[in-house]
């Protein structure tokens, strides 16, 4: 059963991301952000393609201001990759599907 994208907030971030057995992709976004709206469907697609290999999650920075601040998110969209509770890498700005998939595959090696 496809779990889909996990929706994060300040309360569930630690459990869902830092406590995850799988590597995590976290998309920091906001509804009012045009580039974020373009990245959203791409994030949904890679969630399906990497099911069981990655946990894919989204954090609306308006609902998760504390978490966004903790991780120094200053511009959105920002995509961060976590593994074993640690930030492995991050990217700021809109990404295409092929670029995002390549980054995910690289982190699985």
Please place each PLM-identified region on the residue numbering:
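Proteins that catalyze or organize thiol-disulfide redox chemistry
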Residues: 1-55, 62-109
């Amino acid at each position: 059963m496809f779990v889909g994208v996990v929706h994060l907030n300040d309360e569930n971030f630690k459990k869902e991301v830092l406590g995850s057995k799988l590597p995590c992709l976290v998309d920091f976004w906001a509804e009012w952000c045009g580039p974020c709206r373009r990245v959203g469907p791409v994030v949904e697609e890679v969630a399906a393609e990497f099911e069981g290999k990655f946990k894919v999650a989204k954090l609306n920075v308006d609902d998760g201001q504390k978490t966004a601040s903790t991780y120094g998110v200053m511009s959105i969209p920002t995509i961060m990759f976590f593994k074993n509770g640690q930030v492995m890498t991050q990217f700021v700005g809109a990404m295409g599907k092929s670029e995002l998939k390549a980054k995910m595959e690289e982190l699985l090696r």
